[in-house]
Amino acid sequence: MKKEIASHLLEIGAVFLQPNDPFTWSSGMKSPIYCDNRLTLSYPKVRQAIAAGLEELIKEHFPTVEVIAGTATAGIAHAAWVSDRMDLPMCYVRSKAKGHGKGNQIEGKAEKGQKVVVVEDLISTGGSAITCVEALREAGCEVLGIVSIFTYELEAGKEKLEAANVASYSLSDYSALTEVAAEKGMIGQAETKKLQEWRKDPANEAWITA
């Protein structure tokens, strides 16, 4: 599953690997990878594979789920497809409450005591997913965990998720992606080394000259 999804993401250009010409993230950090899972929306076969995979993860790890919650905005579509496949209620969670109307942060119904699984497109440092989890907990929901399409497998993300006491499972990850990219001849040994060094310590730009 991990390599299959990784292959899909590479084929449609949802993930770019540029170890020799790094991207600059909004945080200012240099990165050899850029992920835009919104592109999956434009490819029916890919999004169907993702929905089926997320459903499988949820049934395996969170079988008592009662509500599917998407993170705004990237997780909303995938949450909708998964909830439809599972015939479950769905809601989505904003990064913060609206400044108008009812001032809702949670749109749709997620009632006190209900068991909820969060659907996220990408786990980087885990910030947006944890914001979603906290909002649901404040509403009295029991958050069973998070499922996502892809994770960078960053230590900072793992630590934040552990600190928030929330389980998280991804369809694919950085390790599988770099392995598939190497198998496809998209990166060579030197590029693979840079990618491995970046993941060990993203804040240390020494990987650029590795």
Swiss-Prot record:
GO terms for molecular function: magnesium ion binding; orotate phosphoribosyltransferase activity. Disulfide bonds: none annotated. Gene3D superfamilies: 3.40.50.2020. PROSITE patterns: PUR_PYR_PR_TRANSFER. Orotate binds at residue 124. It comes from the Bacteria. Its cofactor is Mg(2+). Pathway: Pyrimidine metabolism; UMP biosynthesis via de novo pathway; UMP from orotate: step 1/2. Keywords: Glycosyltransferase, Magnesium, Pyrimidine biosynthesis, Transferase. 5-phospho-alpha-D-ribose 1-diphosphate binds at residues 94, 98, 100, 120-128. GO terms for biological process: 'de novo' UMP biosynthetic process; pyrimidine nucleobase biosynthetic process. The keyword Transferase applies. Its EC number is 2.4.2.10. It catalyses: orotidine 5'-phosphate + diphosphate = orotate + 5-phospho-alpha-D-ribose 1-diphosphate. InterPro entries: OPRT (IPR023031), Or_phspho_trans_dom (IPR004467), PRibTrfase_dom (IPR000836), PRTase-like (IPR029057). Transmembrane segments: none annotated. Pfam families: Pribosyltran. NCBIfam families: pyrE. Belongs to the purine/pyrimidine phosphoribosyltransferase family. PyrE subfamily. Catalyzes the transfer of a ribosyl phosphate group from 5-phosphoribose 1-diphosphate to orotate, leading to the formation of orotidine monophosphate (OMP). Homodimer. HAMAP family: PyrE (MF_01208). This is Orotate phosphoribosyltransferase.
